[in-house]
Amino acid sequence: MWRAFEPGLRQRLASLQSTASTQERVRAALLESLPSGRANIAEVSRRLGISARTLQRRLQAEDSGFNAVLASVREELARHYLASTELPCNEIAFLLGYEEPNSFFRAFHSWTGESPERHRQAQVH
């Protein structure tokens, strides 16, 4: 599955200009890192060529934080996968970097107030 997404994600990350905000650069790195299960601040800061502490400071300067950007990317991707694929929720949870599907279900419910399956069904109707 990862191999299908990897080329486009690598191209997107490489095409970001130095003028992109730190949040945009973190989002791009997360899009690449999530399916491989390495969506943590250490991995993202390594991909961006800065220390984890510098990354935290830069995100803070933009009134954000790593966990907020991670949650935003996960929510966006979850909505996309549910609306445009027939992947089972367990696979979506894996692609979003969750170790346990129940963690994904709880997070999705906190974002939307409904279960992933209910959200998918609502998109169909």
Where are the predicted features?
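Extended mid-to-C-terminal alpha-helical interaction segments
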Residues: 1-125
